[in-house]
């Protein structure tokens, strides 16, 4: 199941979803996903805790909106609700979707190695 697109900010979410805030909607979608026995759910890194609280460890959490550091974010980047790989994993993400930071990198292999290193570091 999918919750709210990571490209939507709180204003847009309220506009499109009848004045409900992101966490209310994500909670509702997580409960619905659990009730329907889905294997996993896609959510922004900022909602991992909300989803995990509702679904426990019985569902996988897949997380897009992963960025390396705020200073590296392109101004044209449409992702609004983001965290680093390490932050998302620490919150309970099972899988990370890391596209643009790698694809748009001048050296994708180096970027992947940096991501791995950042996850392992304490």
Where in this protein do the model-derived segments appear?
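Conserved anion-binding
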Residues: 1-40, 44-48, 54-62, 67-74
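Generic hydrophobic/aromatic pocket-lining and core-packing "Φ" positions
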Residues: 30, 48, 85-86, 112
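Conserved, mostly hydrophobic/aromatic
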Residues: 33, 51, 88, 99, ...
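Conserved beta-strand positions in the central sheet of alpha/beta enzyme cores
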Residues: 42, 96-97
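N-terminal amphipathic alpha-helix/helix-capping segment at the start of soluble metabolic enzymes
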Residues: 48-49, 53-56, 83, 117-120
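Glycine-rich beta-strand-to-loop/alpha-helix junction loops that act as flexible
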Residues: 63-64, 98-101
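Catalytic cores of alpha/beta
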Residues: 70-94, 110-111
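C-terminal helical cap(s) of enzyme catalytic domains, especially alpha/beta-barrels
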Residues: 89-91, 101-122
């Amino acid at each position: 199941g999918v919750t709210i697109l990571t490209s939507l900010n709180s204003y847009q979410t309220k506009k499109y979803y009848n004045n409900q805030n992101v966490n209310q909607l994500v909670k509702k979608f997580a409960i619905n996903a659990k009730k329907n026995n889905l294997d996993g759910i896609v959510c922004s890194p900022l909602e991992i805790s909300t989803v995990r609280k509702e679904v426990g460890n019985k569902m996988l959490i897949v997380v897009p909106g992963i960025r390396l550091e705020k200073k590296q974010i392109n101004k044209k980047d449409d992702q609004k609700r983001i965290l680093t790989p390490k932050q998302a994993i620490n919150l309970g993400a099972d899988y990370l979707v890391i596209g643009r930071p790698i694809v748009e990198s001048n050296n994708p292999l180096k970027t992947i190695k940096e991501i791995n290193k950042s996850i392992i570091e304490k």
